[in-house]
Amino acid sequence: MILEGGGVMNLNPGNNLLHQPPAWTDSYSTCNVSSGFFGGQWHEIHPQYWTKYQVWEWLQHLLDTNQLDASCIPFQEFDINGEHLCSMSLQEFTRAAGTAGQLLYSNLQHLKWNGQCSSDLFQSTHNVIVKTEQTEPSIVNTWKDENYLYDTNYGSTVDLLDSKTFCRAQISMTTTSHLPVAESPDMKKEQDPPAKCHTKKHNPRGTHLWEFIRDILLNPDKNPGLIKWEDRSEGVFRFLKSEAVAQLWGKKKNNSSMTYEKLSRAMRYYYKREILERVDGRRLVYKFGKNARGWRENEN
């Protein structure tokens, strides 16, 4: 038994901690699995309890925040829920996603163990109770602070790498030091570099969701009646056929179950990056932010 920071931690040495995700509660709230919390967003729930749709949202978030080409992560290989995802080894991630598998594996391990992209967000003053006597954890890890989504200490790691070499075998992740995981046989075996995929920092084909939306607006003849400008000079636009746009995006991402509800949730990731803005009080209406490029009439 370990007493630290006003908390109690009971550890059974007979259990394998690699497969026992921790469960945190803070001084304000407690989230129980039986309370129906499974309907939340992916960053509010421990990865083991994600639905397959939350798994896809996590994958899309990694694509967008790391400026990866869509071909780096084949969504059809991840038609699984969080429990299955958490059981995958590094070798299985690499087999499913090529060289991007190491990024996915490292990010997932960090989320499983820390719940935030910056470990100092968990202060020792929190009341922590971790019980690992049973094979199935009884409490879901919740994250109340959404700022970790764009934490510069983690989210920008890949941006610091040469964009031409990211999707190769040597991907350096700074999160390794945070993982309480010894080198496994799977890590030792993973030596052969899979096929390359390429990253384009400014992709005119709409690799990222906001670019996809922009390109529909810029080419109305190819996709008529889907989205229209409300105020071109201000970058304000409206979805006319929201579900049709979602299906088109799902086809591009090999995700046949894409809906506008999921697409709109993905669009929220661009708010903090000031690429998209929400127009209050107007349904289906959005605006390009100051960091969006290529939508202005006189822009090169």
Curated annotation (Swiss-Prot):
Ranges for domain PNT: 29-115
SUPFAM superfamilies: SAM/Pointed domain (SSF47769), Winged helix' DNA-binding domain (SSF46785)
A cellular component term, taken from the record's GO annotations: nucleus
Compositionally biased spans, kind Basic and acidic residues: 185-195
Keywords: DNA-binding, Nucleus, Transcription, Transcription regulation
Residues in the DNA-binding region annotation: 207-289
InterPro entries registered for this protein in UniProt: EHF_SAM_Pointed_dom, Ets_dom, ETS_fam, Pointed_dom, SAM/pointed_sf, WH-like_DNA-bd_sf, WH_DNA-bd_sf
Keyword Transcription regulation included in the entry's annotation: yes
Name under which the protein is recorded: ETS homologous factor
Organism annotation: Pan troglodytes (Chimpanzee)
Lineage of origin: Eukaryota, Metazoa, Chordata, Craniata, Vertebrata
Gene (UniProt): EHF
